[in-house]
Amino acid sequence: MRAPSAGWPAGSPHVLVADGWLANAGDAAIALAVDGLVRSVWPDAAVLHAAYHAELVGDEVPELDFVPPIDALLGVDGADPAPDAWASHGERLVRDADLVVSQGGGFLLEHYAPWPRLFAHVQVVDLGVPLAILGQTIGTFRAARARALLRRSLGAAAAVSVRDAPSVAHAVELGAGRSRVVQTSDLSLLLFPDPPTAQPEAPARSGVAVVLTCHEQAPGSDADRARLSARLLAEVLERVADERVTLLSTAQGLGARGVEDDGEIAGAAVTTLTPAEQQRVDTVDGYVGPRAAIETLARHRAVVTQRLHPALFALSQGVPTALLVDADKVGVLDGVDLGPARCTRPTDSGARAAALDAVLTPNARGGVELWESLAPARGRAARNRDVLAGIRPAM
């Protein structure tokens, strides 16, 4: 268990990085990237992360200093209460921040019901603390109260950067000034500034890693999405008859505490296989932190994933990857030529087959060439530094 920091450490400006959802290793990777980004702009900054699940998995990112989530610090409606030690000074810690950064990810989507965070963002603005929305996916919102809250926070934000093109239009429609909305890309790409290099002592990459989920697919019933995941696993096994397949996810191991737990989907998919097929499948159990996910994916010759961040981790290390996701967030890869391996119609058997065939062939493009192909996305991700540098913290 990780104890939270007691308050602001030495340094200036005071930057509070909010909204990290550490149950998802993709969000944990973003937290690492944002921490580095802030310190690259303000080398003497005091940085605290008001993140979720730090008490459970914060040890996976020991270089980050955590405090309770910002909605708990501010005591907004719907938030879990902050620990007793914070009851009297959570708001003061936020008030003493010179900048609050809402770190990128995909939580600003109506189906996630992020109401406490929306209340917290408005309260940050009302306290007079500059608020930066950094590297977000922003969806459409229909609920009148949510729209009103977003109009207040986005309209008053010191900066708004989004990671995909549809989010630009959504942010503007929700009140952000068009001239202030910057299209960037996923912040986790900043963790891979250099091309992959082969380590002489490292074993050759082998086997295929598969990430299954029913949370990032096209609309439909949970049963339909679970069947699609099982079908995808079977299709991979058919194509790699003499290789082992490893199942893991960047969102697993915490059960209901993490809201989404792909371990359940993976387990159900395995039960649909024949006994012979099951013997070829290895399952990674428990929570997988960002570094463990990055290292595990790098050991495989190919990756097939229904989640975005495993694809970004693998591609950034030169691992041929099929990304089968129907969501706005895949726009982080706009301008990157992945061919059929970027499959935005995962329910289409032909499109799915083309994606698998593209990356499971022995001569699939990989290594430095694949890393270089990500240059457009990495370049957009780097714009987030300019976004931060253009903010004048309230010091």
Model-based region annotation:
Residues 1-395:
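Active-site anion-handling motifs in enzyme catalytic cores
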